[in-house]
Amino acid sequence: IDISIRADLIEEVGRIYGVDNIEGKLPVVPMKMGHLDKTTRKIRAKMSNMGLNETLSYILINDKDVHKFTTDEFEEVRLLDPITEERNTLRYSMIPSLYKIYEYNKARENKDVCLFEIGKGFWKKGEEYGENQKICVLMTGKYYEGIGHNKNVDFYDIKGVTEELLDYLG
Protein backbone atom coordinates (compact mmCIF):
# COMPACT_ATOMS: atom_id res chain seq x y z
CA ILE A 1 0.00 0.00 0.00
CA ASP A 2 1.40 3.34 -1.10
CA ILE A 3 -0.28 6.13 0.89
CA SER A 4 1.48 9.46 0.91
CA ILE A 5 -1.35 11.92 0.28
CA ARG A 6 -5.10 12.08 0.92
CA ALA A 7 -5.94 11.05 -2.65
CA ASP A 8 -3.93 7.82 -2.18
CA LEU A 9 -6.05 6.89 0.85
CA ILE A 10 -9.28 7.56 -1.05
CA GLU A 11 -8.00 5.46 -3.96
CA GLU A 12 -7.17 2.52 -1.65
CA VAL A 13 -10.61 2.66 0.01
CA GLY A 14 -12.20 2.58 -3.44
CA ARG A 15 -10.00 -0.33 -4.53
CA ILE A 16 -10.57 -2.45 -1.40
CA TYR A 17 -14.24 -1.62 -0.75
CA GLY A 18 -15.11 -1.50 -4.44
CA VAL A 19 -15.88 1.61 -6.43
CA ASP A 20 -19.28 0.18 -7.45
CA ASN A 21 -20.24 -0.14 -3.77
CA ILE A 22 -19.70 3.58 -3.08
CA GLU A 23 -22.91 5.56 -3.45
CA GLY A 24 -22.56 8.72 -5.51
CA LYS A 25 -23.95 11.86 -3.90
CA LEU A 26 -23.92 15.47 -4.95
CA PRO A 27 -22.49 17.82 -2.36
CA VAL A 28 -24.92 20.03 -0.48
CA VAL A 29 -23.97 23.61 -1.20
CA PRO A 30 -25.84 26.30 0.73
CA MET A 31 -26.99 29.07 -1.60
CA LYS A 32 -27.68 32.61 -0.53
CA MET A 33 -30.10 34.72 -2.47
CA GLY A 34 -28.50 37.95 -3.66
CA HIS A 35 -29.82 41.41 -2.82
CA LEU A 36 -31.19 41.93 -6.34
CA ASP A 37 -33.04 38.59 -6.24
CA LYS A 38 -34.62 39.42 -2.87
CA THR A 39 -35.72 42.85 -4.08
CA THR A 40 -37.10 41.42 -7.32
CA ARG A 41 -39.05 38.80 -5.38
CA LYS A 42 -40.48 41.49 -3.07
CA ILE A 43 -41.51 43.60 -6.07
CA ARG A 44 -43.19 40.62 -7.75
CA ALA A 45 -45.16 39.83 -4.59
CA LYS A 46 -46.20 43.44 -4.07
CA MET A 47 -47.31 43.95 -7.68
CA SER A 48 -49.31 40.70 -7.58
CA ASN A 49 -50.90 41.76 -4.29
CA MET A 50 -51.99 45.00 -5.97
CA GLY A 51 -53.93 42.99 -8.57
CA LEU A 52 -51.47 42.98 -11.46
CA ASN A 53 -50.44 39.84 -13.32
CA GLU A 54 -46.83 39.20 -14.21
CA THR A 55 -45.90 38.58 -17.81
CA LEU A 56 -42.67 37.55 -19.48
CA SER A 57 -42.03 38.78 -22.99
CA TYR A 58 -39.30 38.31 -25.56
CA ILE A 59 -36.10 40.28 -25.08
CA LEU A 60 -35.65 40.21 -28.85
CA ILE A 61 -37.72 42.76 -30.76
CA ASN A 62 -37.79 44.30 -34.22
CA ASP A 63 -35.26 47.09 -34.73
CA LYS A 64 -38.09 49.36 -35.96
CA ASP A 65 -39.68 49.20 -32.49
CA VAL A 66 -36.55 50.01 -30.46
CA HIS A 67 -36.77 53.82 -30.62
CA LYS A 68 -40.58 53.98 -30.91
CA PHE A 69 -41.33 54.72 -27.24
CA THR A 70 -38.22 56.55 -26.00
CA THR A 71 -36.21 59.70 -26.58
CA ASP A 72 -33.09 58.33 -24.86
CA GLU A 73 -29.85 58.50 -26.82
CA PHE A 74 -28.44 55.02 -27.38
CA GLU A 75 -27.56 52.62 -30.15
CA GLU A 76 -29.62 49.48 -30.47
CA VAL A 77 -27.89 46.16 -29.85
CA ARG A 78 -28.51 44.21 -33.05
CA LEU A 79 -27.83 40.50 -33.46
CA LEU A 80 -25.18 39.62 -36.03
CA ASP A 81 -27.09 36.60 -37.31
CA PRO A 82 -30.77 36.78 -36.23
CA ILE A 83 -33.03 33.78 -36.76
CA THR A 84 -35.71 36.13 -38.07
CA GLU A 85 -35.75 39.83 -38.97
CA GLU A 86 -38.84 40.22 -36.76
CA ARG A 87 -36.62 39.61 -33.69
CA ASN A 88 -33.23 41.01 -34.62
CA THR A 89 -32.47 43.43 -31.76
CA LEU A 90 -32.16 43.24 -27.97
CA ARG A 91 -34.74 45.50 -26.34
CA TYR A 92 -33.76 48.71 -24.58
CA SER A 93 -37.16 49.08 -22.94
CA MET A 94 -39.99 46.67 -22.20
CA ILE A 95 -42.59 49.10 -23.52
CA PRO A 96 -42.53 47.76 -27.12
CA SER A 97 -42.98 44.21 -25.79
CA LEU A 98 -45.88 45.17 -23.51
CA TYR A 99 -47.43 47.20 -26.32
CA LYS A 100 -47.46 44.04 -28.48
CA ILE A 101 -49.24 42.25 -25.62
CA TYR A 102 -51.76 45.12 -25.46
CA GLU A 103 -52.37 44.88 -29.24
CA TYR A 104 -52.80 41.10 -28.99
CA ASN A 105 -55.39 41.42 -26.21
CA LYS A 106 -57.20 44.30 -27.91
CA ALA A 107 -57.55 42.27 -31.12
CA ARG A 108 -59.26 39.56 -29.05
CA GLU A 109 -61.53 42.09 -27.32
CA ASN A 110 -59.85 41.61 -23.95
CA LYS A 111 -59.88 45.20 -22.76
CA ASP A 112 -59.14 44.62 -19.06
CA VAL A 113 -55.38 44.11 -18.90
CA CYS A 114 -53.29 44.90 -15.81
CA LEU A 115 -49.78 43.51 -16.24
CA PHE A 116 -46.25 44.11 -15.08
CA GLU A 117 -42.91 42.77 -16.18
CA ILE A 118 -39.51 42.77 -14.54
CA GLY A 119 -36.74 42.19 -17.02
CA LYS A 120 -33.62 43.45 -18.66
CA GLY A 121 -33.01 46.24 -21.12
CA PHE A 122 -29.85 46.37 -23.21
CA TRP A 123 -27.94 49.36 -24.57
CA LYS A 124 -24.81 50.36 -26.41
CA LYS A 125 -22.93 53.68 -26.31
CA GLY A 126 -19.85 53.71 -28.50
CA GLU A 127 -17.90 50.56 -27.68
CA GLU A 128 -19.57 50.10 -24.28
CA TYR A 129 -22.44 47.64 -23.82
CA GLY A 130 -24.69 47.37 -20.80
CA GLU A 131 -27.87 45.95 -19.37
CA ASN A 132 -30.26 47.24 -16.72
CA GLN A 133 -32.95 45.60 -14.64
CA LYS A 134 -36.27 47.36 -15.32
CA ILE A 135 -39.92 47.20 -14.41
CA CYS A 136 -42.79 48.11 -16.69
CA VAL A 137 -46.53 48.31 -15.97
CA LEU A 138 -49.44 48.10 -18.43
CA MET A 139 -52.92 48.95 -17.19
CA THR A 140 -55.95 49.35 -19.44
CA GLY A 141 -59.67 48.75 -19.16
CA LYS A 142 -61.05 47.92 -15.73
CA TYR A 143 -58.91 47.59 -12.62
CA TYR A 144 -60.06 45.19 -9.90
CA GLU A 145 -59.98 46.91 -6.50
CA GLY A 146 -61.70 44.23 -4.46
CA ILE A 147 -64.94 42.28 -4.48
CA GLY A 148 -67.51 44.25 -6.44
CA HIS A 149 -65.13 47.18 -7.02
CA ASN A 150 -64.00 47.43 -10.61
CA LYS A 151 -63.30 50.80 -12.18
CA ASN A 152 -61.81 52.09 -15.38
CA VAL A 153 -58.06 52.62 -15.19
CA ASP A 154 -56.89 56.22 -15.22
CA PHE A 155 -53.65 58.07 -14.62
CA TYR A 156 -54.18 58.08 -10.86
CA ASP A 157 -54.40 54.28 -10.70
CA ILE A 158 -51.01 53.94 -12.35
CA LYS A 159 -49.63 56.72 -10.15
CA GLY A 160 -51.06 54.95 -7.09
CA VAL A 161 -49.44 51.63 -8.04
CA THR A 162 -46.11 53.40 -8.56
CA GLU A 163 -46.28 55.31 -5.27
CA GLU A 164 -47.35 52.24 -3.30
CA LEU A 165 -44.47 50.21 -4.75
CA LEU A 166 -41.94 52.96 -3.99
CA ASP A 167 -43.29 53.36 -0.43
CA TYR A 168 -43.08 49.59 0.04
CA LEU A 169 -39.46 49.51 -1.09
CA GLY A 170 -38.59 52.48 1.13
Explain the meaning of each model-derived region.
Residues 94, 133, 150-154:
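Short intrinsically disordered coil segments
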Residues 139-170:
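N-terminal non-catalytic structural scaffold regions of very large proteins
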Residues 1-113:
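Extended, well-folded interaction surfaces typified by the phenylalanyl-tRNA synthetase beta subunit core
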Residues 7, 118, 132:
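Beta-strand scaffold of nucleotide-dependent catalytic cores
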Residues 96, 117-120, 126, 159-161:
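Regulatory modules associated with amino-acid/nitrogen control
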Residues 16-27, 75-80, 121-149:
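Residues forming anionic-ligand binding surfaces in small-molecule and nucleic-acid pockets
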Residues 95-99, 136, 163:
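Generic detector of well-ordered alpha-helical segments enriched in charged/polar residues
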Residues 105-109, 114, 123-126, 131:
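Mobile "lid/hinge" segments at catalytic clefts and subdomain interfaces of large enzymes
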